[in-house]
């Protein structure tokens, strides 16, 4: 008898039904490393805010992981906010 995947896996599969979310997930996975919101948005042709919304949903589902890091060489006060970066979640 076949068994169904755990509910968490089914929920993750359901999240990928959205074409924008699926494209963003595919881009992050294909990149093989960290991807910024701007990079992901540009790659799939959507606005940054929409990309951020979908990427954060993928993080909440456990499909992606997020971290913060300054991308430029500047440090200290006035260096700006660290970028939120996404990568495929460890299995």
Where are these regions (language model features)?
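Short alpha-helical segments that sit at the start of domains
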Residues: 1-23
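Glycine-centered, phosphate/nucleic-acid-interacting loop/turn motifs that mediate DNA/RNA or nucleotide
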Residues: 62
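Conserved segment of winged-helix/HTH DNA-binding domains
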Residues: 73-91
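Key DNA-contact positions within bacterial/archaeal DNA-binding proteins
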Residues: 38, 48-49
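Short, hydrophobic-biased segments on the C-terminal half of alpha helices
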Residues: 55-56
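A short acidic, leucine-rich amphipathic alpha-helix
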Residues: 24, 39-43
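Short capping segments at the starts of secondary-structure elements
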Residues: 19, 31-36
């Amino acid at each position: 008898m076949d068994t169904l995947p755990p509910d968490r896996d089914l929920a993750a599969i359901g999240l990928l039904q959205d074409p924008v979310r699926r494209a963003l997930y595919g881009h992050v996975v294909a990149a093989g490393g960290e991807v910024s919101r701007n990079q992901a948005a540009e790659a799939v042709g959507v606005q940054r805010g929409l990309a951020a919304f979908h990427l954060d949903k993928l993080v909440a589902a456990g499909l992606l992981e997020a971290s913060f890091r300054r991308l430029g060489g500047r440090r200290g006060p006035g260096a700006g906010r660290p970028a939120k970066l996404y990568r495929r979640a460890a299995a």
